[in-house]
Amino acid sequence: MANSPQAKKRARQNERRAEVNKARRSRIRTFLRKVEEAIASGDSSAAADALRSAQPELMRGVTKGILHKNTASRKMSRLSKRVKALSA
């Protein structure tokens, strides 16, 4: 239990940040799911559009500290590889 005023404040801040981070993480996952669904349906143009809209969301997650830079890059690389295979 937080005893000092500073520790109590940090606990409150951490709760608020956790909520915001949870929403951001959920938003990123939604965009990634849209790409996955487009790939599964076999629609290359829809998959490419979904990938283009997911990329800034992933990078925003990196900027906000939700994802590590390499994690986002790895996800983008793997998704773009799969989208490219659809159109080929």
Curated annotation (Swiss-Prot):
Gene responsible for this protein: rpsT
Pfam families xref list: Ribosomal_S20p (PF01649)
NCBIfam families per the UniProt record, alphabetical: S20
Keyword Ribonucleoprotein: yes
Highest taxon above the source species: Bacteria
Protein family per UniProt: Belongs to the bacterial ribosomal protein bS20 family.
CC per GO annotation: small ribosomal subunit
SUPFAM superfamilies: Ribosomal protein S20 (SSF46992)
Keywords: Ribonucleoprotein, Ribosomal protein, RNA-binding, rRNA-binding
Biological process annotations from GO: translation
Molecular function terms, GO-annotated: small ribosomal subunit rRNA binding; structural constituent of ribosome
Protein name, entry field: Small ribosomal subunit protein bS20
Task performed by this protein: Binds directly to 16S ribosomal RNA.
Start-end of Basic and acidic residues biased regions: 12-22
InterPro entries the UniProt entry points to: Ribosomal_bS20, Ribosomal_bS20_sf
Region of interest called Disordered, as start-end residue ranges on this chain: 1-25
